[in-house]
Amino acid sequence: MNSFRKTCAGALALIFGATSIVPTVAAPMNMDRPAINQNVIQARAHYRPQNYNRGHRPGYWHGHRGYRHYRHGYRRHNDGWWYPLAAFGAGAIIGGAISQPRPVYRAPAGSPHVQWCYSRYKSYRASDNTFQPYNGPRKQCRSPYSR
């Protein structure tokens, strides 16, 4: 078992050592760059095409476009403030319901006949008023309180 551990440790060391060499071989070599002519001036045109998309413009992205009535598809501003409150509220309600202790349902006191049969026979079953004797089939329980 000890030699197996040594073999595994040696194999892992060999694998890690071999894989660390590969990135150094794959690195690009530094090449001498040609000198840049300093007389060239970079210029950028400052015009926009006719159908230029300005991107996000505050107040116009799914917002009021000047129409008199509400139009479908537009985003109403400031209507998302209640989402986190609803999520935390739902979590609190569900968590409170889960953490409540289970209700304890007490068995009815029963009649003196049932109590007498339970105390007399370990295998007594009140649903059909029988008990299991050591030999034979189940038998009816007959107590001094029998009906």
UniProtKB/Swiss-Prot annotation:
It is found in: Cell membrane. It is a single-pass membrane protein. Disruption phenotype: Rough phenotype, with an aberrant O-antigen profile. Mutants exhibit a reduced ability to colonize mouse spleens but are still capable of producing a persistent infection, albeit with a low bacterial burden. It comes from the Bacteria. This is Lectin-like protein BA14k. Has immunoglobulin-binding and hemagglutination properties, and can bind to mannose. Essential for virulence. May be involved in LPS biosynthesis or polysaccharide transport. Keywords: Cell membrane, Lectin, Membrane, Signal, Transmembrane, Transmembrane helix, Virulence. It comes from Brucella abortus (strain 2308). The keyword Oxidoreductase does not apply. One of its GO terms (molecular function) is carbohydrate binding. Residues 1-26 form the signal peptide. Strongly immunoreactive, inducing both humoral and cellular immune responses in hosts during the course of infection. The keyword Transmembrane helix applies. One of its GO terms (cellular component) is plasma membrane. Pfam families: BA14K. InterPro entries: BA14K (IPR012413). The chain crosses the membrane at residues 80-100. Belongs to the BA14k family.
